[in-house]
Amino acid sequence: MGDTASVSEHHESPTVTIVPLHRSHALVAEQQLFQWLKRFKLLMEVYHGLVWQLACTLTVCLLAWLAFPDVQGQCANGIVPALSSIVPVSTLAMLRGFAEFRPHTTNFAHLTVACLLINTGITVCTGFCGERRVIGLSFALVMVFFVLCSGLTYLAGNNPTRWKVIGIGYGWSVIVFYLLLYFSPVLWVSKIYSGLYVLVVTAASAVLIYETLDLIYQRGTLSKNSVCVSVVLYTIVMSLLNMSVAIFSGHVWVQQYAEKHGGRIDGVSLLSLL
């Protein structure tokens, strides 16, 4: 009996701490609130950086265009039409390459300055080649596109059903647009440029949706870098803006090219103006 009592003294039952249910709910709610505030702060930093970069670019462009109002519209034989489509897309590819393969050794502040200088310079040149009303229309359409695409991304989120509805609706809209464009009485050159614009918008939508979903749900380490995300979104906007101006001004450049070459223009010449 004595041995049994001594054993029972040494083997005490473990203590169990019971957390009240209301306290556990409070801890979970506190953690969720902290995560939401952290994500909201990141979103504000990203879009603040985007607005700042767009404001800098547009200010420089307006000053350059107003300082030289007579330099306008004669670019059919130059390289600006091609560069206006190639350079912004190349900077976007460069950004994604650095972000994916060299995220820890890349100074994104320096990369932001480089992208600002490159995209601002090519936008100034594109503005000298395009008409002012075309630039204004392109910028308005790009802003509407950006707000609409971002809003749909926040609305759909990770819900596959919502994305399926959006995809089906957009697909049918594109089909109807191409049918109307095919049977419309406009010139074939305008049909080509209009069809290309739909493809450009579709590609830009896919890239913007992908980047916005990364930002919302922070699916990778790069999405937590506000400087990197803001410059990527800025480059998407500038790519679409420059390509919109190039496409909307394409028929004017084709006409200028034809006038300088005796009314002759072939498919290779047309592609060189894209």
Curated annotation (Swiss-Prot):
Tree of life domain: Viruses
Q: What is this protein called?
A: Transmembrane protein US18
Q: Which gene encodes it?
A: US18
Where in or outside the cell is it found? Host membrane
Q: What is its main location?
A: host cell
Q: Report whether Transit peptide shows up as a keyword of the record.
A: no
Q: Which UniProt keywords apply?
A: Host membrane, Late protein, Membrane, Transmembrane, Transmembrane helix
Species of the source: Human cytomegalovirus (strain Merlin)
Membrane topology note: Multi-pass membrane protein
The family note in this entry says: Belongs to the cytomegalovirus US12 family.
Membrane-spanning segments: 49-69, 75-95, 108-128, 134-154, 168-188, 196-216, 228-248
Annotated Gene Ontology cellular components are: host cell membrane; membrane
